[in-house]
């Protein structure tokens, strides 16, 4: 966690120094954690709600088109749910660094496509009544992707995003079954942006 925070602090000035519109963006995240009622299938749907705080710099490149850079820190809960599952809650921390393209250089509607890399950490463990135990752990280096739409007015912006969370490595072992694979969840977030250096 300390390493992720250090990366965030070192790279944030790059995002803030780039672009005509520099924003601080706070994004409450909604992730649905699913019950795992089928004990013969791998556990999935473990990424829950959280928050993302990011710094973004955007600049107009042609009429209404924009390009930009972003840097953030994201937290999500991790939990394995189920009728016969004993679990511990865990946390997923990640630091996404991303490039943005989209539309919206002035007040009005904007669109945003983000893609880049994400450094992640976190895990959750569980046991079940069949004598099995498992662990889900974040992959340390991942791709990052998001798509969003919203509206901006002077200092402020508001929108909604779909985000692919960092890939997770899943391991499980019981007297009758064993599996080891990787998967990704997706989450939805609102985003509230503030431009501290806005000038009329």
Question: How would you name each of these model-derived features?
Answer:
Residues 35-37, 74-81, 135-200:
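Predominantly the C-terminal beta-signal and adjacent terminal strand-loop region
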């Amino acid at each position: 966690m300390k390493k992720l925070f250090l990366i965030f602090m070192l790279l944030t000035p790059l995002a803030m120094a780039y672009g005509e519109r520099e924003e601080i963006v706070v994004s409450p995240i909604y992730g649905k954690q699913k019950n795992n009622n089928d004990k013969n299938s791998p556990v999935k749907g473990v990424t829950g709600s959280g928050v993302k705080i990011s710094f973004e710099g955007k600049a107009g490149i042609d009429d209404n088109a924009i390009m930009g850079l972003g840097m953030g820190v994201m937290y999500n809960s991790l939990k394995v749910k189920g009728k016969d599952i004993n679990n511990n809650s865990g946390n997923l921390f990640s630091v996404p660094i991303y490039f943005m393209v989209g539309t919206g250089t002035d007040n009005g509607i904007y669109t945003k496509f983000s893609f880049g890399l994400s450094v992640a950490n976190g895990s959750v463990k569980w046991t079940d009544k069949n004598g099995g135990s498992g662990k889900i752990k974040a992959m340390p280096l991942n791709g990052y992707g998001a798509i969003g739409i919203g509206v901006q007015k002077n200092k402020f912006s508001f929108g909604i995003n779909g985000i692919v969370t960092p890939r997770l490595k899943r391991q499980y072992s019981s007297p009758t079954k064993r599996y080891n694979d990787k998967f990704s969840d997706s989450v939805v977030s609102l985003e509230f942006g503030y431009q501290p250096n806005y000038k009329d």
